[in-house]
């Protein structure tokens, strides 16, 4: 294929897809708001219908539907899979009305960088390939619906569907965005994420009797949190206690308290070690009369460094160099993503190929407009090289 012609087509289509980017960010789609997530997928489905691509929708009861859009579905070769998530973090209305605005080279709004901008770059790449007559392989766009809540322990259906649809792919290109510090890198390794809920029961009594009776669930929680927060290994396991709830009034010894623990880990062995520490802290009674119930609330595996992902990056870098793009170093990210599940499935995968930006998961989130075309050009370079 004439890569120069494809790049020129990307440049020609770019402004149209910047508008698409703004449109989909204005459709607010928190993970638990199925109507909003489905509205985002409906927008992308309309683009696919206009191009005559194959569309498959996989219904979900609690979350947005998973959608698979395929260009060149009749090719007998193994597909290339692109994937990004449509859901965002914050409740509707936090960003104002409209939710999105442009400022210089930035689009501000929910999901601008994480991850709607990357999905738009994927559609831009597919549109340009289609317009330039690319028919070699199927190209699948897999739209995930609940990534931001961890594709969790009790809600794995969407990511399982993504992995099943991509299981024969020669490459899985995940479209998460990247900050300035990660520019020039491709993610081939990510930490895993586990969540735990500690529910502590104490003995409630009048505050004036606390010297001789009662057992404060909040005090027990405080001891446990201090012990857990000691675990902060730069390259390994980290513990963060992010939410605590306990007590009801000032003048009562609290009989109930609960807190949530976020765990990041680099490998399965790290996770097993972390679980032993957590269980030991849960079982230890610091305040006589208290007890603790421990529950794992979510689990996302680590994306461990592996040869097939490094081999795919080598192919990508050869294509980048050939096509006048800068090569990317192998990098590790401490945040989780669906690329971990995909890697565990045995599919060659590179992550963080979406748009540039900053401040993901905050009211100040933005994507860098000029990064859209570069992301699309990297994607078509890989697609035409594998």
What positions do the PLM features span?
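Metal-dependent amide/peptide-bond hydrolase catalytic core
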Residues: 1-5, 12, 29, 47, ...
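Phosphate-handling active-site elements
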Residues: 103-105, 125-140, 228-237, 386
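Glycine/serine-rich anion-binding loops at beta->alpha junctions
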Residues: 90, 106-121, 206
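Short beta-strand segments
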Residues: 83-84, 142-144, 172-176, 199-201, ...
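Flexible, glycine/proline-enriched loop segments at strand-loop-helix junctions
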Residues: 109-113, 144-150, 207-215
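Acidic/histidine-rich catalytic neighborhood of metal-dependent amide-processing enzymes
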Residues: 115-189
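Acidic/His- and Gly-rich active-site-bordering loop/insert found
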Residues: 2-110, 131-134, 320
């Amino acid at each position: 294929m004439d890569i120069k012609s494809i790049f020129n087509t990307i440049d020609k289509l770019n402004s149209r897809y910047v508008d698409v980017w703004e449109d989909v960010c204005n459709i607010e789609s928190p993970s638990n708001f199925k109507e909003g997530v489905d509205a985002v997928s409906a927008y992308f489905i309309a683009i696919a219908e206009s191009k005559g691509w194959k569309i498959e929708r996989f219904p979900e009861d609690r979350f947005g539907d998973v959608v698979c859009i395929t260009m060149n579905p009749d090719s007998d070769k193994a597909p290339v899979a692109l994937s990004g998530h449509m859901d965002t973090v914050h409740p509707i209305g936090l960003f104002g009305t409209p939710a999105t605005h442009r400022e210089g080279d930035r689009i501000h709004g929910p999901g601008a960088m994480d991850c709607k901008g990357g999905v738009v770059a994927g559609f831009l790449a597919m549109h340009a390939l289609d317009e330039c007559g690319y028919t070699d392989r199927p190209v699948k766009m897999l739209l995930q619906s609940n990534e931001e809540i961890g594709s969790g322990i009790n809600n794995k259906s969407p990511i399982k569907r993504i992995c099943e649809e991509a299981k024969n792919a020669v490459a899985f290109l995940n479209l998460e965005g990247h900050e300035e510090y990660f520019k020039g890198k491709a993610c081939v390794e990510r930490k895993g994420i586990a969540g735990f809920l500690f529910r502590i029961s104490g003995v409630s009594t009048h505050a004036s009797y606390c010297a001789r009776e009662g057992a404060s669930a909040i005090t027990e929680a405080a001891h446990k949190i201090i012990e857990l927060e000691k675990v902060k290994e730069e390259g390994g396991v980290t513990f963060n206690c992010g939410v605590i709830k306990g007590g009801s009034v000032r003048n009562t010894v609290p009989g109930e308290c609960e807190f949530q623990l976020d765990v990041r880990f680099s490998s399965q062995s790290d996770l097993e070690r972390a679980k032993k520490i957590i269980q030991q802290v849960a079982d230890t009674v610091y305040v006589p009369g208290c007890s603790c119930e421990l529950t794992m609330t979510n689990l996302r595996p680590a994306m461990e460094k592996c040869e097939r992902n490094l081999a795919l990056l080598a192919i990508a870098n050869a294509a980048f160099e050939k096509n006048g793009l800068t090569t990317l170093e192998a990098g590790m990210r401490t945040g989780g993503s669906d690329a971990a599940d995909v890697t565990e499935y045995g599919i060659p995968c590179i992550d963080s190929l979406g748009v540039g930006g900053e401040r993901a998961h905050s009211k100040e989130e933005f994507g860098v407009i000029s990064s859209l075309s570069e992301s699309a050009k990297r994607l078509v370079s890989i697609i035409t090289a594998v």
